[in-house]
Amino acid sequence: MLSLSPILLYTCEMFQDPVAFKDVAVNFTQEEWALLDISQKNLYREVMLETFWNLTSIGKKWKDQNIEYEYQNPRRNFRSVTEEKVNEIKEDSHCGETFTPVPDDRLNFQKKKASPEVKSCDSFVCEVGLGNSSSNMNIRGDTGHKACECQEYGPKPWKSQQPKKAFRYHPSLRTQERDHTGKKPYACKECGKNIIYHSSIQRHMVVHSGDGPYKCKFCGKAFHCLSLYLIHERTHTGEKPYECKQCGKSFSYSATHRIHERTHIGEKPYECQECGKAFHSPRSCHRHERSHMGEKAYQCKECGKAFMCPRYVRRHERTHSRKKLYECKQCGKALSSLTSFQTHIRMHSGERPYECKTCGKGFYSAKSFQRHEKTHSGEKPYKCKQCGKAFTRSGSFRYHERTHTGEKPYECKQCGKAFRSAPNLQLHGRTHTGEKPYQCKECGKAFRSASQLRIHRRIHTGEKPYECKKCGKAFRYVQNFRFHERTQTHKNALWRKTL
């Protein structure tokens, strides 16, 4: 019988009986293997890899962590890999250890047969854990024992700089180090997605190429492996096999289900290195960290608007191609989504369904309301390095930074005047078009912006929000209030001189 890999034993801490990979692997004879074409051999490797990940996902701890690497590189010379950079010291070392090569007689493990008497032991494993928490490949051992030595293969020569994990091969070491540091050295040229492993980016590129043996009957999208194809089908069928025991909410993907469960227990394992804010998922944390840098690397080809992640720019680009089904009868503005249309209508009607419990201020949309709530919490995670001023929102922070740099990236095509923000440019544009979308219900007077309408309505309501603390006099407009304060200060100064 021919097997592309050695028999790999995995053990579970709960059970002491060894289980061989051959129990679940499919093997071919020399004659059968010769009859397979390249695509069939590739499919075989994919199935074996899926089997490996399925087994690790149910809590098995493999003796050899290198199976995935081997199946993707079936003819790889392990000796050359091991001898490569044998004395390299990692730049991000945590303990300062160097790596030493393994003796030659230890490299020929493929020629050996696994002994059925090899039993599991409470070996010391890395306490930091791999990046993929779902696989549960790391099971904590007894902290009072050293790493055990395999009787068949001997000690593992490559030692991780993070504590308590050893590897037989250098590729496994590099993989584990990346899992700790979170480094993703490979980026997709098509969508910008960052990926940890070179083999994974090759698989990812299949998504863009449209090639793959598994084709979706609903949309025609092709996939390189069966598991991804089955997961994708759920987007069409609406199947949600993962149900939350706490609230009954169902999910299509196990990863989404795990992230949701953290909202119940309050677990936030991903922390921002800049401000210490914690998050349920790594994606949320990564997106938040970008907001500190003000980084908006992904730009819309149609209008030039920039976004922090490719998902946002793809969603935005649809607004250009999508039909604008919802048209406002008051101002004629057309919108592509119902929620945007409903929010827009509230600007005309003055309806503000989202009210702040702290100050009573009302808002048109939930997003504006959530943004406002941060002003009461006092949380200001965005700090200017130039002057030290802190901000609640990343947008306000970026706008402020432009006051230092003098940058005005938004230019009017009509007159060439430049502005620091897109809303300011949009408001200026109405001076050319004469558009006044905000109309007063009381007198019919129209205005270019919602803030102008809000100020105007004080005439009808009699509202005077600006009150002088010294004399108690109230004002409708902030300009009048500030002028009054200056006169009060001047009067006080003159009064002091007469004394």
From Swiss-Prot:
**This protein's GO CC annotations:** nucleus
The record's section on SMART domains has: KRAB, ZnF_C2H2
User: InterPro entries of this UniProt entry?
Assistant: KRAB (IPR001909), KRAB_dom_sf (IPR036051), Znf_C2H2_sf (IPR036236), Znf_C2H2_type (IPR013087)
Q: Does the keyword Oxidoreductase apply?
A: no
Ranges where the KRAB domain occurs: 19-101
Q: Where are the zinc fingers (C2H2-type)?
A: 186-208, 214-236, 242-264, 270-292, 298-320, 326-348, 354-376, 382-404, 410-432, 438-460, 466-490
Keyword annotations from UniProtKB, A to Z: DNA-binding, Metal-binding, Nucleus, Repeat, Transcription, Transcription regulation, Zinc, Zinc-finger
**Name listed for the protein in its UniProt record:** Zinc finger protein 439
Origin organism lineage: Eukaryota, Metazoa, Chordata, Craniata, Vertebrata
